Design a protein with these regions (language model features):
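Conserved structural motif at the start of ABC-family nucleotide-binding domains
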Residues: 8, 23-25
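The feature captures the beta-strand-to-loop junction immediately N-terminal to the Walker
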Residues: 39-41
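Conserved ABC transporter NBD signature motif
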Residues: 62-73
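Non-catalytic connector elements of ABC transporters
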Residues: 252-341
């Protein structure tokens, strides 16, 4: 998907609480109509980013622009209500004393409510039958829809979603995630989603920034992040790869699983995704199956070499492997990066 218009740019954002640095020189470009993901573990600074973009938190330094208009720097700080940015909080932040309709109407003027926009958003978010109910009578998924509808109702330039599906069970999270993405695409709404869920980030977002200790480690398409991580840290953030140590000479790196091409020289980390290892039963094979975990759609095979090192491969569920089986392997793809990156 190609995006041509830059809607938001943040440069050099920093934030500390006392001696604890939460964000260090954070930069971001958001394109109109895109869904941008910020992926990071708890405490990485991702929620702080959203709060600064929305205007609820003041950066220590840096600048934020929307359509080339400054909304924050050391001289200017546009208040949240004038930034035209909607926010969906992790806990939804619905008003318990207001029904669904009044919760959604909260950010609309009387004129906007009477224009039909309120009922349009209620219908768009499949909430018509619930509009007279109060939040405490709704399921988690329904409350999430109300929070999203309230954020979308004023037609903001973008919406920010803070861990939007964390509190839902896995099945409901998948269903609602698909609904939300479909709605964002349909309305051409620009969105930033922060999440710790790698599957969510990869499947939903057009661009993903991996955040670690307040720093963006890599920002790229989901495919680029997954297939070409620039460090072991990024590789681990979007999967569970086998990380091997090796030393490259003349473009070849030797590892415990074989010799591979490398664009780098010297000490390297070699990342091999489990799905990039094909295994076959072989009574004379150099590897031994240690464990098999069956997931239905596939299975993860843990195997060991004669040095006692353990590796993982993903395999189709049709072949049954037993502990102690001898196997041989074939590696289809690897990613290498300098060990000291």
């Amino acid at each position: 998907m190609v995006f041509n218009s830059l809607i938001l740019r943040a440069r050099g954002l920093k934030k500390s609480y006392g001696s604890e640095s939460v964000l260090a020189n954070f930069n971001i470009d958001i394109w109109k109509g895109s869904i941008f993901g910020i992926l990071g573990t708890s405490g990485s600074g991702k929620t702080t980013v959203l709060r600064m973009l929305a205007g609820f938190e003041t950066p220590d330094s840096g600048s934020i622009e929307m359509y080339d208009k400054v909304i924050y720097n050391q001289e200017i700080n546009i208040p949240p209500e004038n930034r035209n940015i909607g926010m969906v909080f992790q806990d939804y932040a619905l008003f318990p004393h207001l029904n669904v309709e009044k919760n959604i109407a909260f950010g609309l003027s009387k004129e906007e409510q009477n224009s039909g926009r309120l009922q349009e958003v209620i219908g768009m978010c499949n909430l018509t039958q619930y509009k007279n109910k109060f939040p405490q009578k709704l399921s988690g998924g329904q409350q999430q829809r109300v929070a999203l509808a309230r954020a979308l109702a004023p037609k903001p330039e973008m919406i920010l979603l803070d861990e939007p599906f964390t509190s839902l069970d896995a099945q409901m999270a998948r269903v609602l995630r698909d609904e939300v993405v479909s709605l964002l695409r349909e309305t051409k709404t620009t969105a930033i989603i922060v999440t710790h869920d790698q599957e969510e980030a990869l499947s939903v977002c057009d661009i993903v920034s991996v955040l670690e200790n307040g720093n963006v480690i890599q920002s790229a398409t989901p495919q680029e992040i997954y297939l070409n991580p620039i460090s072991q840290s990024v590789a681990n953030s979007v999967g569970d790869p086998n990380i091997l140590k090796g030393f490259s000479v003349d473009g070849r790196v030797e590892t415990s699983l074989g010799s591979f091409n490398s664009a780098y020289e010297g000490a390297l980390d070699v990342s091999i995704r489990p799905e990039c290892i094909e295994i076959n039963l072989d009574s004379m094979g150099p590897y031994t199956v240690k464990e098999c975990i069956f997931y239905g759609h596939d299975q993860v095979i843990s195997f060991q070499n004669n040095k006692g090192e353990i590796f993982r491969a993903r395999s189709l569920p049709s072949v049954i492997y037993e502990t102690g089986d001898k196997i041989c392997i074939e590696v289809s793809e690897v990613t290498t990066f300098p060990s000291n990156y």
